[in-house]
Amino acid sequence: MVATTITYEQPLNEPMRICLRLEHLFRQLHEHIREPAPAASHLAMLALLKALNVIDRPDLKTKLTQTLTQQTSTLLQLKHSPEVDNHKLQGLLDTLDRYVTHLHQTTRKIGEPLRENAFLTQIRSHLYNPAGPCNFTTPAYALWLQQPSENRINDLQNWAKEFEPLINIVNAILQIIRESTSPQNIVARQGFYQQMLNATSPCQLIQLILPIEKNIYPEICAGKHRLVIRFLPLDVNNNENTKQIAEEISFKLNCCRI
């Protein structure tokens, strides 16, 4: 089924930025991990190692735990609401509790076995070179890419298993925040829209939905107090700064918070 709309997302705090980056990389990993071509294995490897770079921070478990705990606290307040399915809510709360327990009980850094793998470390050290890891910088990797497809797929799946708990946690956090509110129909005048934000109940994630056929995209600038959006036309051959659309733009906007 061909998509007719595109959803742009703007994170407004560090946990959301981490989760969106990881979701993006985990999707790339999932798309290519089972494909037999060496080029697909290369793309899967790049996604795996970039994800490892994203999580290479000492405060990751703390930030994820704080986010899960905050979401749990907010969801608990819904238990006595007549509009809430308490059975479904309790299942979600139990899931979040398991994730928090897992993070507390994990004594090592997430992804530590991958950091200790000398083969992956060699590739990772060349990840951001202009050409990335290539034949003359990482000959072992060049040889690995020529191994039978079943060997490469098996290796990638074994390495990706290290991320499985993290994938589940990231998916849960993002699903809860995305479903916390419903999008509103908005009209931007002369390609510009601004809105004051509630600082006492801060927005955590901005979602903006546009029809693909319009061939326009947003520049989103959001802080604690104000949201500003400019709409620009897609022009891949323009050598000058793209000018803001000078017409009314209808779109959907969702300020997600929990």
Curated annotation (Swiss-Prot):
The keyword Cell cycle applies. Interacts with FtsZ. Signal peptide: none annotated. Belongs to the ZapD family. NCBIfam families: PRK05287.1-4. GO terms for cellular component: cell division site; cytoplasm. Pfam families: ZapD. It is found in: Cytoplasm. GO terms for biological process: division septum assembly; FtsZ-dependent cytokinesis. This is Cell division protein ZapD. It comes from Coxiella burnetii (strain RSA 493 / Nine Mile phase I). InterPro entries: ZapD, ZapD_C, ZapD_sf. It comes from the Bacteria. The lineage of its organism: Bacteria, Pseudomonadati, Pseudomonadota, Gammaproteobacteria, Legionellales. Cell division factor that enhances FtsZ-ring assembly. Directly interacts with FtsZ and promotes bundling of FtsZ protofilaments, with a reduction in FtsZ GTPase activity. Its main location: cytoplasm. Keywords: Cell cycle, Cell division, Cytoplasm, Septation.
